């Protein structure tokens, strides 16, 4: 208590030298009383040290627990968000790919079966013997060459550059077989009405029924029925079976020329029966085509359903984690 009063603070470094310490005057009670006071002060010092240690330990533990809880919650939330996002992306990609593959496989298999059915019934219904079984044994048939019942023309040269520079609504049909044979659309209209087109080069011998305004490229032949005994749709179905048989495959590019097309012979039942058969086959063909067009739409719809349920489950899991963390903190 007394020593600090004699410290020399005038120096740069405060000090209390030995000679000055020896000169400090102190008052003392009797020895017995000194000993009692010293014992009391020692006990008090020990208690203070113990209390300080206990308080320090408690505060450290409490602070550590709070910091640990906060850091754990924060870290858990961050990790959960990162892992959930990563997992969600991976699952979404895997499930979407798997779903697309499964749907494509299923729908493609369905399409193949439909096409087989269509080909079977088309060939069955266009067979003379079967037509007589269905409509009567005495049904008469007439045989014509294509040149006897149709006007035969060929398309003109229409380049891709011409299509780009003359955009419009009317399709240009070419030797292509995808996209219904359409190469593009222009303002011009070379044909308007009910026609049959066939590919003359490349994928030669592919036949299409047309009804409306259109144009044809130079690799596309065009037939216009001129005989009132012939149904254009029925003729198109017959040619889909017969025309490929006359394709010249010895050249570098397969061909079915106007001259060869003109010589093809075909047999026809009465017009009324032609129309009935054509309506049946046309409806069946449309059903197959609708299925083809519906595949991408079906896949897209299933993907949207997948995304919805993924998001729903992800949000539910996040909510459960938040509730669990809140309960633990409380």
UniProtKB/Swiss-Prot annotation:
* Induction section of the entry: Detected at low levels after 6 but not 96 hours growth (at protein level).
Q: Which domain of life is it from?
A: Bacteria
Keyword terms of this UniProt record: DNA-binding, Restriction system
InterPro entries membership: Restrct_endonuc_typeI_TRD, Restrct_endonuc_typeI_TRD_sf, Type-I_RE_S_subunit
According to its UniProt entry, the protein's GO biological process terms are: DNA restriction-modification system
User: According to its UniProt record, which protein family does this protein belong to?
Assistant: Belongs to the type-I restriction system S methylase family.
Q: What this chain does, per the record?
A: The specificity (S) subunit of a type I restriction enzyme; this subunit dictates DNA sequence specificity. As the bacterial DNA is methylated on this sequence and this is the only type I methylase in the genome, it is probably responsible for all of the methylation on this site in the genome. The R subunit has multiple frameshifts and is probably not expressed in this bacteria.
Subunit structure, as described in the record: The methyltransferase is composed of M and S polypeptides.
Domain characteristics, as noted in the entry: Contains two DNA recognition domains, each specifying recognition of one of the two defined components of the target sequence.
Q: What is the recorded name of this protein?
A: Type I restriction enzyme MpnII specificity subunit
């Amino acid at each position: 208590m007394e020593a600090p009063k004699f410290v020399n603070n005038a120096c740069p470094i405060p000090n209390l030298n030995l000679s000055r310490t020896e000169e400090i005057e102190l008052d003392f009670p009797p020895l017995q009383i000194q000993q009692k006071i010293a014992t009391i002060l020692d006990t008090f010092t020990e208690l203070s040290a113990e209390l300080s240690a206990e308080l320090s330990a408690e505060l450290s533990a409490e602070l550590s627990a709070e910091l640990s809880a906060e850091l754990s919650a924060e870290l858990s939330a961050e990790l959960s968000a990162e892992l959930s996002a990563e997992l969600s992306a991976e699952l979404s990609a895997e499930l979407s790919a798997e779903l697309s593959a499964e749907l494509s496989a299923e729908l493609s298999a369905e399409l193949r079966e439909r096409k087989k059915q269509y080909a079977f019934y088309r060939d069955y219904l266009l067979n003379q013997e079967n037509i007589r079984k269905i409509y009567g044994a005495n049904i008469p048939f007439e045989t014509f060459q294509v040149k006897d019942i149709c006007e035969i023309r060929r398309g003109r040269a229409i380049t891709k550059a011409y299509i780009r520079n003359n955009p419009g609504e009317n399709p240009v049909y070419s030797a292509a077989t995808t996209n219904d044979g359409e190469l593009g659309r222009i303002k011009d209209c070379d044909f308007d009405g009910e026609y049959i087109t066939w590919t003359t080069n490349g994928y030669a011998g592919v036949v299409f029924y047309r009804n409306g305004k259109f144009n044809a490229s130079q690799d596309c032949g065009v037939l216009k029925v001129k005989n009132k005994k012939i149904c254009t749709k029925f003729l198109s179905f017959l040619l889909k079976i017969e025309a490929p048989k006359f394709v010249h495959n010895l050249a570098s590019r397969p061909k079915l020329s106007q001259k060869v097309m003109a010589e093809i012979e075909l047999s026809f039942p009465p017009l009324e029966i032609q129309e009935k058969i054509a309506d049946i086959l046309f409806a069946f063909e449309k059903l197959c085509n609708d299925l083809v067009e519906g595949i991408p739409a079906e896949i897209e719809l299933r993907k949207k359903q997948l995304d919805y349920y993924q998001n729903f489950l992800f949000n539910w899991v996040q909510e459960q984690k938040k509730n669990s963390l809140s309960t633990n903190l409380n």
